[in-house]
C-alpha cells in the first residue's frame, strides 16, 4: 500500500469523471496529430460537430419549453375547471404569484446545497488528477 496516496471511497460520479479524464488524456494528442496532418478536414469536422451540438441543444431546449407550456396549459385548465374561471384568475393566480415571490430564493438554496455537495467530489477528482500529473512528470 502506497503511503503517499490517500485512500478514497470513490463514488460513481468520481469514477465516471476519472474515466473521462483518462479518455481525454488519450483524445487530446490524437486530435492534435490529426489536426496537424489534415487541417482542412479537421476544421470542417469541427464546424460540422459544433453546428450539430448547437442544433441538438436548441431542439432539446425547444422541446423542454413546449413540454412546460403543455403542462402549464393542463394545470390551468384543471384549475379553471375545478375552481371556476373567476376564482382561478382573480384569487388563485394572485395567491400563487405571492407564494412564488415569497420563496424566490428557495431554488437558490437548493442550488447552493448541490454545489457544496459537488465541490467535495470535484476536490477528490482534482486531487487524483494532480497525483496522476505528478506521476507522469516524474
From Swiss-Prot:
Intrachain S-S bonds: none
Pfam families referenced in this protein's UniProt entry, alphabetically: Apq12
Topology, Cytoplasmic side: 1-39, 85-138
GO cellular component: endoplasmic reticulum; endoplasmic reticulum membrane; membrane; nuclear envelope; nuclear membrane
Family: Belongs to the APQ12 family.
Membrane topology: Multi-pass membrane protein
Record has Membrane as a keyword: yes
Residue ranges that the UniProt entry lists as topological domain Perinuclear space: 59-67
Keywords, ordered alphabetically: Endoplasmic reticulum, Membrane, mRNA transport, Nucleus, Transmembrane, Transmembrane helix, Transport
InterPro entries reported in the protein's UniProt record: APQ12
Protein name per the record: Nuclear membrane organization protein APQ12
General function of this protein: Involved in the regulation of lipid homeostasis in the endoplasmic reticulum, thereby impacting nuclear pore complex biogenesis and localization, and nucleocytoplasmic mRNA transport.
Gene Ontology biological-process annotations: lipid homeostasis; mRNA transport; nuclear envelope organization
Transmembrane segments: 40-58, 68-84
Location of the protein in the cell: Nucleus membrane; Endoplasmic reticulum membrane
